[in-house]
């Protein structure tokens, strides 16, 4: 297809499940932590180029509720990656007009990480460029249960 024949992008939301980074690392004989770090590097590359494709929404599933079953050292490394990502990349994201939102259950997440999440969401709240959602401590089942509770609670209270 010639460049002049390219159609405008109709994709409005890209969702990525960041899975397999630890296995990738193990296959290469490296610690699982290295794979997780490579996953963050890939996310940074994607964030640099996603604007070229005019995709307004990006959701990255980075830590599922099942990840709590992993060894404590691995969980700690994953929390540190989110910490470091926010601390290192927040200003660049903000300067590039990215609106950052972290979705998922905040129970169990260290308080300092929650403060970083809250401050990053607050800082970028008025940005109207890429809408980046990071699903952290997230599961579809949990989301259904929470939605059900929110839908039925008013009914239960009225009875």
Across the structure, where does each feature detected by a protein language model lie?
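Single conserved hydrophobic/aromatic residue that forms the stacking wall/gate
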Residues: 150-159
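Flexible, compositionally biased loop and terminal segments
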Residues: 1-151
